[in-house]
Swiss-Prot record:
Bound cofactor: record note: Binds 2 manganese ions per subunit.
GO biological process: cap snatching; DNA-templated transcription; symbiont-mediated suppression of host gene expression; symbiont-mediated suppression of host mRNA transcription via inhibition of RNA polymerase II activity; viral RNA genome replication; viral translational frameshifting
Family affiliation: Belongs to the influenza viruses PA family.
Residues that bind Mn(2+) 1: H41, D108, E119, I120
Lineage of the organism: Viruses, Riboviria, Orthornavirae, Negarnaviricota, Polyploviricotina
A Pfam family that the UniProt record links to this protein: Flu_PA
UniProt source species: Influenza A virus (strain A/Swine/Hong Kong/81/1978 H3N2)
Keyword hit for Transcription regulation: no
Residue span of motif Nuclear localization signal 1 (NLS1): 124-139
Cofactor(s) listed in the protein's UniProt record: Mn(2+)
Top-level taxon of the source organism: Viruses
Mod. after translation: Phosphorylated on serines and threonines by host kinases, including human casein kinase II.
Motif segment (Nuclear localization signal 2 (NLS2)): 184-247
Keywords: Cap snatching, Endonuclease, Eukaryotic host gene expression shutoff by virus, Eukaryotic host transcription shutoff by virus, Host cytoplasm, Host gene expression shutoff by virus, Host nucleus, Host-virus interaction, Hydrolase, Inhibition of host RNA polymerase II by virus, Manganese, Metal-binding, Nuclease, Phosphoprotein
Protein name: Polymerase acidic protein
Length: 716
């Protein structure tokens, strides 16, 4: 066979084929059939291009004799046969000058008349099988495929054969001649049988035995064997006319594909109704801390000791009174509960030795606030299955709420920097591998950007409260334990600081299942007057409990100090996730890292340092009614972190549904922006699925309003 190849083909073609095989580590002397196949393919590519020119008028003409006077341009650019680097250079320059989409794999030719790349195939098997393999391999709508066989058959994309009859006849004749020459030397059978399919990564996986029988049984109707089903699936053109495909499906499926244009999408409908209220477990921007610097008191680190020490830093306590009642609650009970906390803290101080934990007396006000004896009595099903009118409680539909401005303010605050650091730079050992080195550099840069962020304070506060509450729920199931809400940080000067936000009193907590609820009463300090945005504090009873002297530019001013009290509840699973809120740092770091990776792959070097240190560059942060908001890389880090933290603090079924459903619409809009001409069916159904999640949750409503801003700007 090797001798035949050297005799039958032009020496230049033989040389190119040898070079190509060596590039892939193959030996022409051993893999002789492959050698012959490569030479054949090369020759057909050259023949395809031969004699085809474009004249001054841009018309395609055929010139067989070399007329030296004609100013002619070759119609085809030959890419096959060049070394890879050169071939890609040619492809890139064609794409740059013509604006044609760059193919993923190297094609064989470029046609300057039709402005498209061409993939030439020469097969010893059936043309349509080989065509499908090629199409599956290159997966590009834009590259034109033209297959020839040694038996004179051909197949091309959309039956558009590019060349005139005569030129194609020359190619078919040459292939027929090669086949006869091989046959006369007894080489054809071996050559014909040696052709493998297009080698894609997915090698055919043979199924035998029981699995094979199951596969044959579970074929869709009208398929006789797994093979012909496979062939059908391989040939299923996903971007072909979808209506045609649907008609092959079931008679029940009817979907009209509507083009999705700039004018198609409408904004999401946000609900009307009273303004939405705060529903997080802890207060955020309105929280006030009583703090001690450089704590060194006896029992430092024991929450109760720390709390008492923090309480003693404040001297403005006064007789508490209700300034904003809770609409549905028994407000005097909230007032009595706070007075009880003060009294019991005073009792502790009068004792010889302060205990490590404090269980509150089970007074009537606490029993009421913690829902003691309020749960309906559980009855065994056996005892009541004969009751004729046994039914589940009618539950009310949730009341719709409209978006209030406070939630955007909460988010803005969460992105801001505080004057304290809330996380330590983790002391992790020496890096062993270079990738670890890059990772720790990135981590250090990221930590520097977010360690002082208010969202990071919320993480540490959330972790502390959930851990303390879960511990107490397990350790003191029957007790009304008093749990201080504490956080720790470092000041600018590096001094340690312990902060008290208020207290929680836990109810009975026999938590068997993950979703069993433990009730608690939270009491949180604040300087925010609840009468400014009463709708935000709907679920709270607010007391005025003291006056605080604040240093301002004009000297000291006295401000009333408030206590926000409410009944709340949580479960084991929610506390478990709350304890793991530090994951938010990881999630936002990974998002930043993918931005760095994208930059690095464009520049072909690690861009970590430039990414964080180029202070002049701004990055898109999000969309507001004003347009696309931009900011420094630090601001991007903090915004991503705040989003992740709010997803945790405001986790809810409404958020789950909204995120999943709105993502689909987002992908369609992005496809439109990328000029991919998306089509949709039942867009109304998608809008319904998104909008049924827009009920009353402040964080979901804010995200929906951001989504509307995005739609407006994306479709301009």
């Amino acid at each position: 066979m090797e001798d035949f190849v050297r005799q039958c083909f032009n020496p230049m073609i033989v040389e190119l084929a040898e070079k190509a095989m060596k590039e892939y580590g193959e030996d022409p002397k051993i893999e002789t059939n492959k050698f012959a196949a490569i030479c054949t393919h090369l020759e057909i590519c050259f023949m395809y291009s031969d004699f085809h020119f474009i004249d001054e008028r841009g018309e395609s003409i055929i010139v067989e004799s070399g007329d030296p006077n004609a100013l002619l341009k070759h119609r085809f650019e030959i890419i096959e046969g060049r070394d890879r680097t050169m071939a890609w250079t040619v492809v890139n320059s064609i794409c740059n000058t013509t604006g044609v989409e760059k193919p993923k794999l190297l094609p064989d030719l470029y046609d300057y008349k039709e402005n498209r790349f061409i993939e030439i195939g020469v097969t010893r098997r059936e043309v349509h099988i080989y065509y499908l393999e090629k199409a599956n391999k290159i997966k590009s709508e834009k590259t034109h495929i033209h297959i020839f066989s040694f038996t004179g058959e051909e197949m091309a994309t959309k039956a558009d054969y590019t060349l005139d009859e005569e030129s194609r006849a020359r190619i078919k004749t040459r292939l027929f001649t090669i086949r006869q020459e091989m046959a006369s030397r007894g080489l054809w059978d071996s050559f014909r049988q040696s052709e493998r399919g297009e080698e894609t990564i997915e090698e055919r996986f043979e199924i035998t035995g029981t699995m094979r029988r199951l596969a044959d049984q579970s074929l869709p109707p009208n398929f006789s064997s797994l093979e012909n089903f496979r062939a059908y699936v391989d040939g299923f053109e996903p971007n072909g006319c979808i209506e045609g495909k649907l008609s092959q499906m079931s008679k029940e499926v009817n979907a009209r594909i509507e083009p999705f244009l700039k004018t198609t999408p409408r904004p999401l409908r946000l609900p009307d109704g009273p303004l939405c209220s705060q529903r997080s477990k802890v207060m955020m921007m309105d929280a006030l801390k009583l703090s001690i610097e450089d704590p060194s008191h006896e029992g430092e680190g024991i929450p109760l000791y720390d709390a008492i020490k923090c309480m003693k830093t404040f001297f403005g306590w006064k007789e508490p009174n209700i300034v904003k009642p809770h609409e549905k609650g028994i407000n005097p009970n909230y007032l009595l509960a706070w007075k009880q906390v003060l009294a019991e803290l005073q009792d502790i101080e009068n004792e010889e030795k302060i205990p490590r934990t404090k269980n509150m007396k089970k007074t009537s006000q606490l029993k009421w606030a913690l829902g003691e004896n309020m749960a309906p009595e559980k009855v065994d099903f056996e005892d009541c299955k004969d009751v004729s009118d046994l039914k589940q409680y009618d539950s009310d539909e949730p009341e719709s709420r409209s978006l209030a401005s406070w939630i955007q303010s909460e988010f803005n605050k969460a992105c801001e920097l505080t004057d304290s650091s809330w996380i330590e730079l983790d002391e992790i050992g020496e890096d062993i591998a270079p990738i670890e080195h890059i990772a720790s550099i990135r981590r250090n840069y990221f930590t520097a950007e977010v360690s002082h962020c208010r969202a990071t304070e919320y993480i540490m506060k959330g972790v502390y409260i959930n851990t303390a509450l879960l511990n107490a729920s397990c350790a003191a199931m029957d007790d009304f334990q008093l749990i201080p809400m504490i956080s720790k940080c470092r000041t600018k000067e590096g001094r340690r600081k312990t902060n008290l936000y208020g207290f929680i009193i836990k109810g009975r907590s026999h938590l068997r299942n993950d979703t069993d609820v433990v009730n608690f009463v939270s009491m949180e300090f604040s300087l925010t007057d609840p009468r400014l945005e009463p709708h935000k504090w709907e679920k709270y009873c607010v007391l005025e409990i003291g006056d605080m002297l604040l240093r301002t530019a004009i000297g000291q001013v006295s401000r009333p100090m408030f206590l926000y009290v409410r009944t709340n509840g949580t479960s084991k699973i929610k506390m478990k996730w709350g304890m793991e809120m530090r994951r938010c740092l990881l999630q936002s770091l990974q998002q930043i890292e993918s931005m760095i990776e994208a930059e690095s792959s464009v520049k072909e070097k690690d861009m970590t340092k430039e990414f964080f240190e180029n202070k002049s560059e701004t990055w898109p942060i999000g969309e507001s009614p004003k347009g696309v908001e931009e900011g420094s890389i630090g601001k991007v880090c903090r915004t991503l972190l705040a989003k992740s933290v709010f997803n945790s603090l405001y986790a809810s079924p409404q958020l789950e549904g909204f995120s999943a459903e709105s993502r689909k619409l987002l992908l369609i809009v992005q496809a439109l922006r990328d000029n991919l001409e998306p089509g949709t069916f039942d867009l109304g159904g998608l809008y319904e699925a998104i909008e049924e999640c827009l009920i009353n949750d402040p964080w979901v409503l804010l995200n929906a309003s951001w989504f509307n801003s995005f739609l407006t700007h994306a479709l301009k």
